[in-house]
């Protein structure tokens, strides 16, 4: 979602701030801005356009300085407008602005604080909760910005990551985090803040990941961190190699297309040359944990939730362990019955998804002790919070609509299935060898499906004029149908729904007409004949079927039946393979419709607020 960059240096940091914002554009935003200390004054430029336009405006305004902050905003409180864009200034009365501040998150008690600050003379120029923090810091300021921020955050309820600097202390930037990510970048006589280490790629590779409750004081030659209790703490610096090429398109039209075609590499890297199935793939002590548990509780949001639904089919059928899958944002508010013997599994691309983190903490508060995360970021809060972890190696995903993160999550969850089965004595050596062979061939199988792109592009031309679509799947392919429908609605803005094919007669069939494309996933599995009957129900009502069928499924093109043949049936891993054509269909449909594929309206990449 929102992005933060800040710096204190002995050189002009304007290019660093702007470049950092460009690297954070993938998170989604509707406005942006930068503020700097210049010649004894606070100066800023804000825009509701793209960062490229902001950069041009900054050059026109001749902004430059050695201390500053920058921000990309995804609107929560207040409409997307320049006056709501960050950074926000604070001054009392007619005084010159003294405080500049940017903020990610949601302050739940902002109305109460706003009224209090208005009562002592502060005038608000925006609708945001962020301006409340700026005025609060200014109100508490008595010559020491670090102390003022510590006092201010004690008054805040909700989630936040903030960066702030003061006109009266020009060589200092202060940051704080609670429930929203913030990192420190270390330099030589210069230091940096960002909401994502990617923003600092090419500037520094020495990164400190702040913990919840931390407040950090950045000066030229010093970084000082205190925890929630105000006690000075040391946080380990990590050497982080972020490849700037991840933020470059190369020969591709969009990042989503690039990331779709990176999936053979991403899945191969996630498998990391695994020679055998062992619980220790998920961390030290995993064998003991896997022996103790009697069930799994999977917590996730969005696309990651669909990965969890797929894993439920695998784990219950192969490892024979009961699995519950919960939408994280619902689970934490439901009066559920906890099972202390369950393994809580969280799934998150970023490892910072606010709802999933909150659900994880809620599960632990109910006495559920064993936790595992499947995550793409090794240094994320999710990994730090969990007992066990499997790090996918998808690489940085820029497009808002998840592609390679999803397939690598599925790959990791299948490995988890096999490790659980082995621990329970339900995986023979022959079965292990067979599954490992299939996994090693998976990148090539994905590559073969990517070769179907020209055929899928022809379908996209037909889909582009539609306003509704239906996706059907059965068994372990039903979650893949859900994911396909989500992708289409996310980036093409076509309303799409997914159903188990067996549920057609229980309502969705009423929607089927010649104007409703029906996308069907038709692998050659035990449910194929049942699925064929469901497809005939659609044809009988004049519906147009678009079928991804395995080569030997004996489903042929006919009137009202359009078929693309998948290269091969891939057994238990078929859901991963069948994901790929649905991604391509959504992508090319969106291209024909002319939408902003990488930055769809109203959506953000990393959802770090509840």
Swiss-Prot record:
GO CC terms in record: cytosol
Classification via InterPro entries: GATase_2_dom, GFAT, GFAT_N, GlmS/AgaS_SIS, GlmS/FrlB_SIS, Ntn_hydrolases_N, SIS_dom, SIS_dom_sf
MF-aspect GO terms: carbohydrate derivative binding; glutamine-fructose-6-phosphate transaminase (isomerizing) activity
UniProt enzyme class: transferase
Residues at the active site: 2 (nucleophile), 605 (for fru-6p isomerization activity)
Gene3D superfamilies for this protein: Glucose-6-phosphate isomerase like protein, domain 1, Glutamine Phosphoribosylpyrophosphate, subunit 1, domain 1
Catalytic activity annotation: D-fructose 6-phosphate + L-glutamine = D-glucosamine 6-phosphate + L-glutamate
Gene Ontology BP terms: carbohydrate metabolic process; fructose 6-phosphate metabolic process; protein N-linked glycosylation; UDP-N-acetylglucosamine metabolic process
SUPFAM superfamilies: N-terminal nucleophile aminohydrolases (Ntn hydrolases) (SSF56235), SIS domain (SSF53697)
Keywords: Aminotransferase, Cytoplasm, Glutamine amidotransferase, Repeat, Transferase
Keyword Cytoplasm among record annotations: yes
Residues of the SIS domain: 286-426, 459-600
Keyword Transferase: yes
Ranges where the Glutamine amidotransferase type-2 domain occurs: 2-221
EC number assigned by the record: 2.6.1.16
Compartments where found: Cytoplasm
Superkingdom as given in the UniProt entry: Bacteria
Pfam hit, one: SIS
Primary localisation category: cytoplasm
PANTHER family, per the entry: GLUCOSAMINE--FRUCTOSE-6-PHOSPHATE AMINOTRANSFERASE, ISOMERIZING, GLUTAMINE--FRUCTOSE-6-PHOSPHATE TRANSAMINASE (ISOMERIZING)
Role summary: Catalyzes the first step in hexosamine metabolism, converting fructose-6P into glucosamine-6P using glutamine as a nitrogen source.
UniProt xrefs under NCBIfam families: glmS, PRK00331.1
Binding partners and assembly: Homodimer.
Listed name of the protein: Glutamine--fructose-6-phosphate aminotransferase [isomerizing]
Organism: Bordetella parapertussis (strain 12822 / ATCC BAA-587 / NCTC 13253)
């Amino acid at each position: 979602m929102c992005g933060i960059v800040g710096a204190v240096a002995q050189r002009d940091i304007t290019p660093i701030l702007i470049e950092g914002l460009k690297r954070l554009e993938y998170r989604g935003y509707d406005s942006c801005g930068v503020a700097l200390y210049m010649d004894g004054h606070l100066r800023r430029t804000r825009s509701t356009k793209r960062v490229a336009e902001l950069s041009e405006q900054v050059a026109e305004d001749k902004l430059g300085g050695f201390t500053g902050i920058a921000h990309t905003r995804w609107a929560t409180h207040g409409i997307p407008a320049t006056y709501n864009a960050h950074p926000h200034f604070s001054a009392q009365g007619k005084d010159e602005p003294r405080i500049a501040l940017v903020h990610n998150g949601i302050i739940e008690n902002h109305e109460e604080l706003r009224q209090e600050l208005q009562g002592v003379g502060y005038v608000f120029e925006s609708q945001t909760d962020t301006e409340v923090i700026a005025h609060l810091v200014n109100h508490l300021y008595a010559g020491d910005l670090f102390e003022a921020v510590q006092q201010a955050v004690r008054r805040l309820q909700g989630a936040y990551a903030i960066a702030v600097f003061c006109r009266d202390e020009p060589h200092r930037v202060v940051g704080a985090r609670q429930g929203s990510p913030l990192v420190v970048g270390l330099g030589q006589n210069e230091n940096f803040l960002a909401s994502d280490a990617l923003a600092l790629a090419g500037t520094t590779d020495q990164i400190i990941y702040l913990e919840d409750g931390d407040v950090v004081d950045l000066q030229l030659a010093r970084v000082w961190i205190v925890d929630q209790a105000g006690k000075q703490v040391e946080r380990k610096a990590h050497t982080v190699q972020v490849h700037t090429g991840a933020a470059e398109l190369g020969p591709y039209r969009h990042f989503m297309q690039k990331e779709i075609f990176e999936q053979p590499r991403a899945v191969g890297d996630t498998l990391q040359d695994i020679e055998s199935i062992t619980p220790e793939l998920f961390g030290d002590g995993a064998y003991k944990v896997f022996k103790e548990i009697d069930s799994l509780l999977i917590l996730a949001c969005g696309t990651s939730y669909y990965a969890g639904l797929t894993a439920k089919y695998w784990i219950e059928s192969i490892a024979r362990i009961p699995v519950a899958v919960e939408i994280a944002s619902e689970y934490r508010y439901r009066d559920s019955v906890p099972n202390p013997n369950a393994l809580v599994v969280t799934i998150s691309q970023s490892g910072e998804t606010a709802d999933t983190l909150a659900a994880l903490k809620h599960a632990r508060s109910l006495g559920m002790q064993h936790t595992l995360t499947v995550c793409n970021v090794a240094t994320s809060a999710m990994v730090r919070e969990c007992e066990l972890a499997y790090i996918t190696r998808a690489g940085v995903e820029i497009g808002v609509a998840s592609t390679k993160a999803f397939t690598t999550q599925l790959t990791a969850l299948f490995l988890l299935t096999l490790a659980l089965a082995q621990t329970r004595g339900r995986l023979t050596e022959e079965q292990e060898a067979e599954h490992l062979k299939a996994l090693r061939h998976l990148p090539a199988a994905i590559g073969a499906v990517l070769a179907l792109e020209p055929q899928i592009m022809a379908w996209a031309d037909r889909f582009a004029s539609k306003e509704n679509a239906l996706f059907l799947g059965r068994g372990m392919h039903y979650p893949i149908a859900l994911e396909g429908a989500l992708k289409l609605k996310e980036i093409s803005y076509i309303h799409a729904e997914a159903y188990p094919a067996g549920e057609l007669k229980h309502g969705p069939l009423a929607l089927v007409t010649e104007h409703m494309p029906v996308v069907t996933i038709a692998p050659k599995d035990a449910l194929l004949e049942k699925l064929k009957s469901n497809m005939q129900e659609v044809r009988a009502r004049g519906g147009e079927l678009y079928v991804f069928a395995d080569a030997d499924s004996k489903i042929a093109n006919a009137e009202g039946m359009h078929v693309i043949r998948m290269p091969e049936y891939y057994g238990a891993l078929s859901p991963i393979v069948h994901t790929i054509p649905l991604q391509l269909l959504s992508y090319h449909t969106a291209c024909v419709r002319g939408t902003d594929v990488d930055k769809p309206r109203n959506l953000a990449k990393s959802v770090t607020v509840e």
